[in-house]
């Protein structure tokens, strides 16, 4: 079969700062998926995109081409509107876990396709696999059955959704092109648009523990994704939220499930509850639902917990089985008295990863009980010798490297010193 273009033509055009035509973009994504464009050629194009950018039309067409490489899901058979939420990830970010059943309890359908963790950011599926018997991989029919029974499902995305993105993501990871905003936006949105929900709410994290540490970059990414959703006919909005400090009081798989259960029981850390409610209200508003019972009340009265337990059971999970507990633990204590001024999310995340809560490469087996409990947050008054963190691992040998990662992770100042942290919500962006 003769090809319409050559890889060198496409690379040269973007290298020389020309716009790529719709036809060039369609061919490029399709040819790479078919193996006509070699990895080294696509690497050169990705670097040219990183350096020279893409305009909104190019990003939109690139996203459409990735969607077209696979299947597009439909939820038209459901009797309620569908809405999804996507977070760019961070440390202690367990918000999806209480959020999906909460929004379902308030009347929307939530097909939540989630991922696994890599590096210092935790993955939703890894956390849920702390629950005995819980199944991450479902067929489309199984997904539909769970969502019809429970109103929500949290599971892995099937291989048929945007397969071009899977291939490109692996290449970006090893070519220094992960940070290109056009490529990040199209990677996320190709999968989310292919999911077929009528609305999408984005939680774009910023701060030391986030993928986008600069708030300006995070806002640009959020605006780019909201625009892509709008162009695709998906009602899309975004919150840019803080990840300079870990979310909640835990970082690690089973530890975060415990915290989720506290939130669903009407308790839990105030920042986790606040962000869960903010996102729940955004999701319900995005699909035009005015619930009879508010999200805040649905957390307190057990409605959200009921959906959670049904959802876990429907996916094979044992709600009453004990959660994994690490074999060993050590405490990190305050070396002075005063006010806790900072708690660095990145350092906490790296430490949890070294304890066994995260993986260095895909497929690595996790220690589901490993991670960190947080006993004080910025603004808290602490005394010398007071516990700040508890580190959990199955292997004593992991503690030294985990402690090394925590050097400078928190600072203690005078009781009148100002704390140094971002507001929980920095910006709201709507299409």
Across the structure, where does each feature detected by a protein language model lie?
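Well-ordered secondary-structure scaffolds
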Residues: 5, 9, 14, 19-22, ...
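Active-site-proximal beta-alpha loop/turn segments in soluble metabolic enzymes
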Residues: 46-50, 127, 165-174, 203-212, ...
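Short beta-strand segments
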Residues: 113, 147, 155-157, 203-207, ...
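Phosphate/diphosphate-binding glycine-rich loops and adjacent basic-rich segments that engage nucleotide
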Residues: 148-197
